[in-house]
Amino acid sequence: MTKEEALNKFAQLGAVWFGNSKQHFAFSAYCRLQGWNKLADKWKEEAEEEWEEAEEVLNRLVELGCKPADLQELMKTQEFPFCDDPKLQIEGDYQPEAIKELSELAEAFCDDYPTKKLIEKWIEGEKDHMAWECQYLNYIDKLGYENFLTAMM
């Protein structure tokens, strides 16, 4: 991956983080409206973390000479579907391949320590995120969907 390709991928990830954050805030509000307060709290926590990470991306991109307008343009091309079904939302958000992509991106920034460390921090956050999603999917399988939703109240 060339430096320019890595920078473009980094900018795309920033757009994804902002979009995911907005999607997760919306899903959190929906869960709260349905009475699934524990689930709402978890998605809100995730949304806040992703928003902070997106801000870190934006700040780093500006430091690297990118313009915020470029990130905004990238956000227009991203789709962030909203599910009103918690299981579908979790399944749609659960993307283990993201760890590999982030690891490859971190390696592309081997000569840019601040960016590499930032990406490595996200890798750990994504591992945690996927761990709770996997845990929730296992709860759904073991408890049954209705019992899971009741437990999330």
Residue ranges of model-derived segments:
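Iron-associated oxidoreductase/ferritin-like identity signal
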Residues: 1-153
